[in-house]
Curated annotation (Swiss-Prot):
Residues 12-24 have a biased composition (Polar residues). It comes from Arabidopsis thaliana. May mediate extracellular signals to regulate transcription in differentiating cells. It catalyses: L-seryl-[protein] + ATP = O-phospho-L-seryl-[protein] + ADP + H(+); L-threonyl-[protein] + ATP = O-phospho-L-threonyl-[protein] + ADP + H(+). Residues 102-386 form the Protein kinase domain. The active site is at 227 (proton acceptor). Pfam families: Pkinase. SMART domains: S_TKc. This is Shaggy-related protein kinase beta. Residues 12-65 are annotated as: Disordered. Belongs to the protein kinase superfamily. CMGC Ser/Thr protein kinase family. GSK-3 subfamily.
Length: 431
């Protein structure tokens, strides 16, 4: 196995370049509604119009798909600048259906999953993001099913959904989402380009909100995101409110049921996934959160592996060789596998800058080999690293107030001990 040769060379002080150059994208290649970072060309024309057709053309589709429809299917599938998309939204409580029109403005993201474009609702002047994904006509779309369940300040809001077709009779699902202008990825890179570090208050603020969103997904909804990375973390650059997006890989994990291990973008992929585990838990998301937090301090990925083998090597170079029990906890099938002994590096040498003991402690609690030893999302929110946010005098660098951080619902705190609740909600925020 190449990982053993790589680690043996590291242990002996030699450099070894792996010949394992198997092409591996940053995200898995398994189904149409999973996000993948590849390019797709688009055209630009102006002021063409797509309009909703009658529901008759949906009659040939399976019942599962028809149940997902708010209206009929739109004929045409344009995302070109200026194109008008007119659809309908079902009225609530016996109210009439609403006609809604969107004007496509420009593409803001592309990939094998489809395309995301910015648009404006003509009735309200509100900016939205529309994610268009190819829909398998045989199945319900898992991303749509999950997004309809979500309602949290740190999760991007699904406003509307509709289906559209092409001349080739391809069916596309269009998810109309709230528009958030920035990503944590771009925010982090902007500091790196200026040879600056992201201010600590932003690292604390962003990581805290990610953890709060993870607690909501894991404990309230029962969903594992499975692709947490800076590109999937939206941030409002005025309020600095963070929202998780892209649920194309998300899934409700059922104990005892197998799942694919080739999931999650490589740099943020938990080691049990690299070991091929199929009965993993939402702890894979918490590993990803630890990777994101470290990246905000470093300005670059903590574990930048070029292949799955290289990824494991990068992890072991920092965390050291996993103990036999840790390997068993990640995947029992690898219980007897022997790795060369590599010592773990202390965190202060990893960060190479003045980082608080609290920050290093949280990173170490998130980046544990054993999934069951990683702290939960709610435990992470209560960590002393975030105590600055709980200070009643805390504010953004420009003096503006922090976004709401402590307005937990009863569902979010369900099962939390009195002590944990006390640590989570500062006295000034208690009702």
């Amino acid at each position: 196995m190449n990982v053993v040769r790589r680690l043996t060379s590291i242990a002996s002080g030699r450099n070894f370049v792996s010949s394992d150059n198997v092409g591996e994208t940053e995200t898995p290649r398994s189904k149409p509604n999973q996000n993948r970072e590849e390019t797709e060309s688009t055209e630009t024309t102006s002021y063409e119009k797509d309009s909703v057709s009658s529901s008759e053309n949906s009659d040939h589709l399976p019942k599962e798909i028809r149940e997902d429809m708010d209206c009929g299917i739109i004929k045409g599938n344009g995302t070109e600048s200026g194109r008008i998309i007119t659809t309908k939204k079902k009225g609530l409580n016996d109210q009439k259906d609403k006609t809604i029109s969107y004007r496509a403005e420009h593409v803001i993201g592309t990939g094998s999953f489809g395309v995301v474009f910015q648009a404006k609702c003509l009735e309200t002047e509100e900016k939205v993001a529309i994610k268009k994904v190819l829909q398998d006509k045989r199945y319900k779309n898992r991303e749509l099913q999950i997004m309809r369940m979500l309602d949290h300040p740190n999760v991007v809001e699904l406003k509307h959904s509709f289906f559209s077709t092409t001349e080739k009779d391809e069916l596309y699902l269009n998810l109309v989402l709230e528009y958030v202008p920035e990503t944590i990825y771009r925010a982090s890179r902007s500091y790196t380009k200026m040879n600056q570090h992201m201010p600590l208050i932003y690292i604390q603020l962003y990581t805290y909100q990610i953890c709060r969103a993870m607690n909501y997904l894991h404990q309230v909804v029962g969903v594992c995101h499975r692709d947490i990375k800076p590109q999937n973390l939206l941030v409002n650059n005025v309020t600095h409110e963070v929202k998780i997006c892209d649920f194309g890989s998300a899934k409700m994990l059922i104990p005892g049921e197998p799942n694919i291990s080739y999931i999650c973008s490589r740099y943020y992929r938990a080691p049990e996934l690299i070991f091929g585990a199929t009965e993993y838990t939402s702890a894979i998301d918490m590993w990803s959160v630890g990777c994101v937090m470290a990246e905000l301090f470093l300005g670059h990925p903590l574990f930048p592996g070029e292949t799955s083998v290289d990824q494991l090597v990068e992890i072991i170079k920092i965390l050291g060789t996993p103990a036999r029990e840790e390997i068993k906890n990640m995947n029992p099938r690898y219980n007897d596998f022997k790795f060369p002994q590599i010592k773990a590096q202390p965190w202060h040498k990893i960060f190479r800058r003045q980082v608080s003991p609290e920050a290093m402690d949280l990173a170490s609690r998130l980046l544990q080999y054993s999934p069951n030893l990683r702290c939960t999302a709610l435990e992470a929110c209560a960590h002393p690293f975030f105590d600055d946010l709980r200070d009643p005098r805390a504010s953004l660098p420009n003096g503006r107030a922090l976004p709401p951080l402590f307005d937990f619902t009863a569902q979010e705190l369900a099962g939390a001990s009195v002590e944990l609740r006390h640590r989570l909600i500062p006295e000034h925020a208690r009702k």
